A protein has these predicted regions:
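A short helix->loop->beta-strand "cap" motif at the edges of active sites that frequently abuts
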Residues: 48-52, 211-213, 244-247, 336-337, ...
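Generic long, charged, amphipathic alpha-helical segments
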Residues: 362-393
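Short internal beta-strands
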Residues: 52-60, 83, 180, 245-258, ...
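C-terminal structured "cap/appendage" subdomains that terminate the fold
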Residues: 389-426
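Short, surface-exposed amphipathic charged segments that create phosphate/polyanion-binding patches used
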Residues: 124-128, 262-270, 390-391, 440-451
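His/Asp/Glu-rich metal-coordinating catalytic cores
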Residues: 1-29, 38, 45-227, 233-244
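Hard-cation-handling environments
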Residues: 202-347, 362
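A polyampholytic, Gly/Pro-enriched intrinsically disordered region
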Residues: 74-79, 267-281, 362, 445-455
């Protein structure tokens, strides 16, 4: 099994059961640690999976903290629902999985190095290659032999955006009979220019600090928070804000703090040339004067009693949960403050409402007027765009026998599959859930079924 993620957020597809008994699976291969790729693995363990979970060292470290965090959220949500259920006499809600299930899953992690070809069992070999999406992220080459027939399948995982800070650009793979590729941005581009993140971010900080306000950044705890710390270290090192030399930066997310420690542990083999040049000079690319971390709720609350202009980085990135909602409550109404978005905001989320110009939002049962300036750091993305995906596919020296397009909205997967056929001249297939292909004959067996959305 390659990846087993969890659907998250409102109005998304039901988490479907996989079409095999988890106890019959021997190996799970994980491309990277994001919950939409790893989040359902503890559920498989709960249902009987006891094999090995193969992934890179950095992904194993991130899964160790992220799956436990996900389990804490399931338990907290179940307890909240059950308090309401007990009052109304409804049956109790069981969490999807527990912290004990997540702990059991992490004990099955079996990490490997990038570029290391390993034999899983008779007839199956695998190799993980850096795909530049997140620390530890990989595309996976799988060699399968059955009888006299051998085929090679390459799973792209999530292909990274070029020129991201800290991590390397996506590595190309030279050959495959079949390719399974993501298509998150398979119908759009990020723009031709490399954005000047540091320059734009410096402008936002200067304009806000001059008014005496805070810059509040809703940020994904893993990946995006570390990129922002990287930019701020550069701003401070180059003295780009000489009028505010000692400004403080709070990372107010226990998961983000743990993830930053994982980044610092997995420097070699994961960091790009620029980040490694700093490391080799004895400089931690994610550390600087004025950086403060808050673990406890009390420490978090104290941030809003400090009147000095500062940066507050907190999760969740779409403002749907977590400590960020408290910081929004204390800063949204203040015209001198700025809320700076640095990641995708899904439809229906509080973050999306704010970037679309909401004049008032409800937080903790209270209507909060939006007086703060809303900024978006454009172009910052961990995903390759349409051209980046095509560039990655162009790395194959021989055109694959077939390309399977997954991991995108249904109209986007169809669009990108047509684009692949047009550009490379090979059959491309955008399956629905349950779609299947005979790898020996290259025939589509089933197209699959569109999954109904939740009511």
């Amino acid at each position: 099994l390659v990846d087993c993620g969890m659907e998250q957020g409102p109005d998304l597809y039901v988490n479907q059961d996989i079409p095999v008994n988890p106890s019959e699976i021997d190996y799970i291969l994980i491309t990277h640690a994001h919950i939409d790729h790893s989040g359902n693995i503890p559920l498989l363990v709960k249902k009987g999976f006891s094999g090995e979970i193969i992934t890179t060292f950095a992904t194993a470290d991130l899964c160790d903290i992220m799956l436990r965090d996900s389990a804490h959220i399931q338990e907290f949500e179940a307890e909240w629902r059950n308090r309401k259920a007990r009052r109304s006499g409804e049956p109790e809600y069981e969490p999807i999985y527990t912290v004990a299930d997540a702990d059991a899953a992490t004990k099955l992690l079996a990490p490997v190095d990038y570029g290391q070809k390993i034999t899983l069992c008779d007839g199956i070999e695998v190799r993980f290659n850096d795909v530049g999406h997140l620390l530890g992220s990989a595309s996976i080459e799988v060699w399968v032999t059955e009888g006299e027939v051998s085929k090679k399948i390459v799973f792209s995982g999530d292909v990274g955006n070029k020129n991201q800070p800290i991590i390397k650009d996506p590595q190309l793979v030279k050959e495959a009979d079949y390719v399974v590729i993501e298509s998150t941005y398979g119908d759009r581009t990020h723009g031709e220019d490399i954005p000047d993140y540091v320059g734009e971010f410096t402008r936002i900080l200067r304009e806000t600090f001059q008014k005496g306000g805070n810059v509040v950044i809703p940020s994904f705890a893993v990946g995006r928070t570390q990129e922002i710390l990287y930019f701020i270290r550069e701003i401070k090192e180059k003295n780009l804000l000489p009028e505010f030399p000692g400004f403080e930066v709070y990372v107010d997310s226990p998961l983000a703090i743990e993830a930053t420690n994982v980044f610092n542990k997995n420097v070699k083999g994961c960091f790009d040339e620029d980040a490694m040049a700093l490391v080799n000079q004895g400089i931690n690319p994610l550390l600087f004067q004025g950086l403060k971390t808050t673990i406890t709720s009390d420490e978090s609350r104290q941030i809003n009693f400090d009147t000095k202009p500062k940066v507050i980085l907190s999760a969740s990135g779409m403002c749907e949960a977590g400590r960020i909602r408290h910081h929004l409550k204390h800063n949204l109404w203040r015209p001198e403050c700025t809320i700076c978005f640095v990641g995708y905001q899904a439809v229906g989320t509080l973050g999306r409402k704010l970037i679309e110009g909401a004049q008032s939002v409800k937080l903790f049962g209270e209507n909060i007027t939006v007086n703060a300036k809303i900024e978006v750091l454009r172009g910052i993305s961990g995903h390759a765009d349409m051209n980046g995906l095509l560039d990655w596919l162009a790395g194959f020296e021989k055109v694959p026998d077939r390309v399977m397009v997954v991991h995108g909205e249904d109209t986007v997967t169809d669009h990108f599959a047509a684009l692949v056929e047009e550009q490379f001249g090979c059959p491309a297939f955008a399956p629905y859930s349950g779609g299947s292909v005979d790898l020996a004959t290259n025939e589509i067996i089933t197209i699959g079924q569109k999954i109904p959305k939740k009511a």
